[in-house]
């Protein structure tokens, strides 16, 4: 069973636009924003990649790490590692990009481990390495930046109840009506005091690519 408190390490075949391989373990102490995308996904090109570039420009990389994950579950012959290198250079992606490792099934390993539904998917980890957000689709810029900043305020060893207080204050400050009509599917992995794992689901039907279940 997937546990956001101890999420699995990334399983990748290589890195592009990075001097050395990265791991979630090595990135602990920073907030990590991971964008899973495909080169031929319209939603990735129109929204997710430009958004990730804006986040990289606005946040201090010593505090917030932006990384990409090329998770190919379709058109494998076209979206090769060599094509990705050209893509990263041509579109001037300012962050490292990992290639999700294939395992013979349609869905690559990291994508399957995190139960992603397709691309674009955005995963946000706190300073302690816990998965705190899982977005499928197109989260709003302001909402996303506010959530990243809230996580950046937390200390690495921040108690869970202290983190929950910040989460509640953030939720109260955001316009919930606007939030509920956003173009995304959101899993909130914050564990509150009064429940298990809360899931606030918003379904996006605009431009994202859905992955087929493994083995199909």
Indicate residue ranges for each PLM-predicted region.
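N-terminal "domain-start" segment that seeds a small globular fold
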Residues: 1-25, 95
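Short active-site neighborhood of thiol/selenol oxidoreductases, capturing the structured segment around
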Residues: 22-48, 52, 66
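Active-site acidic short loop of glycosyltransferases
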Residues: 28-30, 61, 93
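Structural recognition of the beta-strand scaffold that forms the well-ordered cores
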Residues: 35, 65-68, 96-99
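Structural microenvironment flanking redox-active thiols in thiol-disulfide oxidoreductases
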Residues: 46-91, 102-108
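Thiol/disulfide oxidoreductase modules built on the thioredoxin-like
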Residues: 91-93, 101-147
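Short, solvent-exposed cationic patches
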Residues: 149-175
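Histidine-centered metal-binding segments
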Residues: 170-216
């Amino acid at each position: 069973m997937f546990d956001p408190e101890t999420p699995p390490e990334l399983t990748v075949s290589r890195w592009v636009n990075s001097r050395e391989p990265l791991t979630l373990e090595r990135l602990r102490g920073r907030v990590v924003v991971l964008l899973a995308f495909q080169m031929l996904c319209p939603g990735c090109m129109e929204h997710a990649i430009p958004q990730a570039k804006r986040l990289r420009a606005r946040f201090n990389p010593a505090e917030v790490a932006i990384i990409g994950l090329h998770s190919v579950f379709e058109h494998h012959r076209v979206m090769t590692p060599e094509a990705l290198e050209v893509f990263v250079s041509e579109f001037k992606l300012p962050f490292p990009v990992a290639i999700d490792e294939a395992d013979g099934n349609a869905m690559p390993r990291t994508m399957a481990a995190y139960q992603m539904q397709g691309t674009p998917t955005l995963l946000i980890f706190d300073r302690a390495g816990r998965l705190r957000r899982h977005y499928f689709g197109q989260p709003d810029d302001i909402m996303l930046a506010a959530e990243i900043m809230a996580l950046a305020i937390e200390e690495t060893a921040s108690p869970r109840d202290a983190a929950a207080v910040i989460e509640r204050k953030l939720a109260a400050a955001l316009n919930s009506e606007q939030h509920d009509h956003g173009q995304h599917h959101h899993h909130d992995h914050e564990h509150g005091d009064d429940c298990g794992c809360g899931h606030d689901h918003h379904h996006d039907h605009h431009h994202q690519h859905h992955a087929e279940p493994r083995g199909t």
